[in-house]
């Protein structure tokens, strides 16, 4: 190990930065965030750097470097493109036994800057010892996606009770066991969900010796339209910690595979006129599982609040006092249209977009047809495949031109994506001709003509 990782408390300490350009600015931002008082020396200094120095209560010296500039400084940064000058600064600092960092010159450094994941007070540093800084940054980027921003709040919560817990448990092993329970249980879950007051209440109960009562929790998570890369960071984290998963037909297998391996999986999918599990039973199942203390993942295709009946499910949870979180997903209209190269709005073609359920009830579709035939709007029909002949007939009957551009997107955003474009009048024929099946999204509007120019993702097959 060439460099020993240490964390330096710079608050109120004077730090010398030699250089006034972009590199000096980047380093100075980090130093200012850590509370350092900046002394910047350079013949020319960028305006943003000037403001940063003034904000830190530091000083600007518009001239060349002098060794006396090191006086009173606890850390030295050389950030110029003048190699002899950088070497001189390094030599002067080392002679005085003051830590020095020379940007992009590890051999001249006694300290180096790592790539940082900041979840203050939790801070993670990644370093390659200056050998491969790009690799360190890539690893940091991965950590940024894995560690929620709320981890800092969790660390802050623990800090407020640290002294009290130390008094209760003088033995280090007991303290470790206490905090492991906190960080792996319902207290951490509440804090990470943004429910800080509830997390603090549970921690107070635990500190006072009462076993904190916390029922399980339900995570209502939107799985997006199919491509796993479209999941949010929060969705992935909750998928990895759930004890049981209730999922529907629209959740792609590749997404389901990202759930915790040992989690129980329960299929509650619904097809038209064939509800594998009635909605009221799904609602009750969520309540029952949560009351058993389990972390329950309700995984829904698309977004749970857009034709997903997510509102009904959390109404039931709220009625029973079950904690829940809602994680939005990319809805099918947005995801599938983007992957098909069809912008839903465009100033030359459509100034509004409507998301419409095409699901028939008793063989009819009770929609405000007159509103749907207005100009400069895009219509997106969910679950519209079965009722497509009626939808097309009614739109044309109420004034939408039969030659209005239209598209069918089957299994959008996945490797099996198929896109077929034509006209409003053509859609029913296209379904039969190409054996289109659910899940398929229907888009009607002038924006469809842009697909030929804007398409970028091709799945199994597409046809115009």
Curated annotation (Swiss-Prot):
* Function in brief: Then it catalyzes the NAD-dependent ring dehydrogenation of precorrin-2 to yield sirohydrochlorin. Finally, it catalyzes the ferrochelation of sirohydrochlorin to yield siroheme.
According to the record, the residues making up region (Uroporphyrinogen-III C-methyltransferase) are 216-464
Question: Protein name, please?
Answer: Siroheme synthase
Q: Which UniProt keywords apply?
A: Cobalamin biosynthesis, Lyase, Methyltransferase, Multifunctional enzyme, NAD, Oxidoreductase, Phosphoprotein, Porphyrin biosynthesis, S-adenosyl-L-methionine, Transferase
Q: Name one Pfam family in it.
A: CysG_dimeriser
Q: Does this entry carry the keyword Lipid metabolism? A: no
- Give the Gene Ontology MF terms in alphabetical order: NAD binding; precorrin-2 dehydrogenase activity; sirohydrochlorin ferrochelatase activity; uroporphyrin-III C-methyltransferase activity
What Gene Ontology biological process does one annotation of this record name? Answer: siroheme biosynthetic process
Question: Where does the chain bind NAD(+)?
Answer: 22-23, 43-44
Catalytic reaction(s) noted? uroporphyrinogen III + 2 S-adenosyl-L-methionine = precorrin-2 + 2 S-adenosyl-L-homocysteine + H(+); precorrin-2 + NAD(+) = sirohydrochlorin + NADH + 2 H(+); siroheme + 2 H(+) = sirohydrochlorin + Fe(2+)
> What's the family?
In the N-terminal section; belongs to the precorrin-2 dehydrogenase / sirohydrochlorin ferrochelatase family.
Answer yes or no on keyword Cell cycle: no
PANTHER family assigned: SIROHEME SYNTHASE, SIROHEME SYNTHASE-RELATED
Tell me its EC number(s), please: 2.1.1.107, 1.3.1.76, 4.99.1.4
Q: Which PROSITE patterns does the record associate with it?
A: SUMT_2
Modified positions (Phosphoserine) in chain numbering: 128
Q: Where does S-adenosyl-L-methionine bind?
A: 225, 301-303, 306, 331-332, 383, 412
* Domain of life from the UniProt record: Bacteria
Which InterPro entries does UniProt cross-reference here? Answer: 4pyrrol_Mease, 4pyrrol_Methylase_sf, 4pyrrole_Mease_sub1, 4pyrrole_Mease_sub2, CobA/CysG_C, NAD(P)-bd_dom_sf, Siro_Cobalamin_biosynth, Sirohaem_synt_dimer_dom_sf
Part of which pathway?
Answer: Cofactor biosynthesis; adenosylcobalamin biosynthesis; precorrin-2 from uroporphyrinogen III: step 1/1; Cofactor biosynthesis; adenosylcobalamin biosynthesis; sirohydrochlorin from precorrin-2: step 1/1; Porphyrin-containing compound metabolism; siroheme biosynthesis; precorrin-2 from uroporphyrinogen III: step 1/1; Porphyrin-containing compound metabolism; siroheme biosynthesis; siroheme from sirohydrochlorin: step 1/1
Q: Where is this region: Precorrin-2 dehydrogenase /sirohydrochlorin ferrochelatase?
A: 1-203
Organism, as annotated: Pseudomonas fluorescens (strain SBW25)
Enumerate the active-site residues: 248, 270
Q: Which Gene3D superfamilies match?
A: Cobalt-precorrin-4 Transmethylase, Domain 1, Methyltransferase, Cobalt-precorrin-4 Transmethylase, Domain 2, NAD(P)-binding Rossmann-like Domain, Sirohaem synthase, dimerisation domain, Siroheme synthase, domain 2
